[in-house]
Amino acid sequence: MALLKTMPIIRSLTRGKSIRLLQKQSTKRTNPCVYLEAKAVEQTPATEFNSILQEIISTEYNYSVDLKKTLNEIIMPIEGQSMEREAIGICTCFKTLNQLHTKLYQQMISSGSPVYSLSQSLPAFRDVYHMYTINLSGISAIEKIISDPSSCNSQLLIPLQHLLRYPIHLARVCKMLRKYPFLNGDFRMAVKTLDDFRELCSYIDQEKAREESYQVLSALCGNQGVAVDIPRHIKFKGSVIPATSFIYDFNACVFCDDGLVVWTRYVKKIEMKAVSIEQCLRVDELSNSILVCTLNMKGKLLNRHLAPQTMAASVFLKWYHERAGISNGKENKLNRLKVVNAKT
């Protein structure tokens, strides 16, 4: 009975201890957070700079893992199969890409300087990524033979997306070295590497645009005798509204920066079929329409009237004004040279 009488007292005492213990634990849990915040405030330039370098290395490691995953899931299972030439090309390029980044990650670890490793690997980057870009058409060929084509496109485009990260990382490195010259890093090398990678990304983007333009024009023109092997940048691909008094059998167009115009019924690449392939000669802005004078493949002159204040019309006008400005600039320069020569 005595024991039973003392039980409530023991329970109350233990309950009080439990509450005090929980209070102590809660304060202990908040202490590390406070310490981390204080530490973050007191972070030195050297530790911040080293964290950026480590981030570059860890990003390269994750990228290498993604490449190996794609290699094992997509490339290797179809290697022994009969494939189109485009599919073989993209597979070969991807394997070379995987080797490049595996070696690059190892160099970053051994040298401890990811910026130096990137600067040394730049020539290989140019060759490998250029070849990979011009073989992108092989992705659609691979999608036809793999069991799960839904993930193929996204996984095989990862290299071009990852390439854009290098200038971002290098810009952060340059910013730190410019702000804190005492840091252990070669500022000139970092700036040059950043400029080279920016130039490479711009070049690859242009190559990708050329390749996409080539694929669209190839699908449209087929075997109609158009020299689609000439690099052309597509300026406009979209709906066209003919002027109200004129009716044509097309409702969209592909317009290239060299003046090639392909009239088509649909905008989507799969449904695109060329109605007429023409070369743009002149563009005039009339009161009720935009007049586009063209020459078709049979040598016949045509007048296309587009509705004003539309996307297609504005693109035609902009292209024509830019081209006219360039030609006028060349003529003025030649005239000035003639005047100078006459005076001398």
Swiss-Prot record:
Coiled coil feature spans: none
Q: What are the boundaries of the signal sequence?
A: none
**Which intervals hold domain DH?**
48-207
Give this protein's Gene Ontology molecular function annotations.
guanyl-nucleotide exchange factor activity
Query: Its Gene Ontology biological processes?
Result: meiotic cell cycle
Q: Name one GO cellular component term.
A: cell division site
**Subcellular localization(s) per the UniProt record:** Cytoplasm; Nucleus
Q: Which UniProt keywords apply?
A: Cytoplasm, Meiosis, Nucleus
Question: What is the recorded function of this protein according to its Swiss-Prot or TrEMBL entry?
Answer: Has a role in meiosis.
Q: What is this protein called?
A: Meiotically up-regulated gene 10 protein
Naturally occurring in which organism (per UniProt): Schizosaccharomyces pombe (strain 972 / ATCC 24843) (Fission yeast)
